[in-house]
């Protein structure tokens, strides 16, 4: 089990945690943002250290014990049950980043695509709210100008 294997397996585990725990507890935006933070943590570090990872990536501290419990339950499936430190393989981070779904699909046939390169933008410039009058959720997106494509 080399660093490539460990990096991919740990990120796949994070993906499942995001889908099975973060999404039901929060929403699709938070699921995508969690994976954004996880990928970026791996991208900017050469060594993985689980405590530092959890402190940086978990914006909701209540998810830290849930993550640890989830790792006890599902870690063996990803061969990471006893792993908390390993060297990070940058090529593996790039491979996993390509496979991630970063689109919020709404029931109104509208899709919002969030960029994995700059996750801070999604947190700073996208807000979710509830409209009492329409009895619907909405996303509010802030920007300076549209890019002509």
Feature annotation, model-predicted:
Residues 1-96:
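Long, hydrophobic alpha/beta structural blocks
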């Amino acid at each position: 089990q080399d660093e490539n294997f460990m990096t991919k397996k740990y990120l796949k585990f994070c993906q499942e945690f995001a889908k099975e725990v973060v999404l039901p507890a929060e929403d699709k935006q938070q699921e995508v943002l969690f994976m954004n933070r996880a990928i970026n943590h791996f991208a900017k570090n050469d060594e993985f250290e689980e405590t530092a990872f959890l402190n940086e990536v978990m914006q909701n501290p209540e998810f830290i014990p849930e993550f640890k419990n989830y790792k006890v339950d599902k870690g063996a499936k990803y061969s990471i049950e006893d792993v908390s430190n390993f060297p990070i393989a940058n090529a593996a981070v790039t491979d996993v980043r390509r496979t991630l779904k970063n689109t919020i699909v709404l029931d109104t046939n509208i899709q919002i695509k969030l960029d994995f390169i700059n996750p801070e933008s999604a947190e700073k410039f996208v807000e979710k709210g509830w409209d009492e009058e329409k009895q619907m959720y909405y996303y509010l997106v802030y920007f300076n100008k549209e890019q002509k494509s």
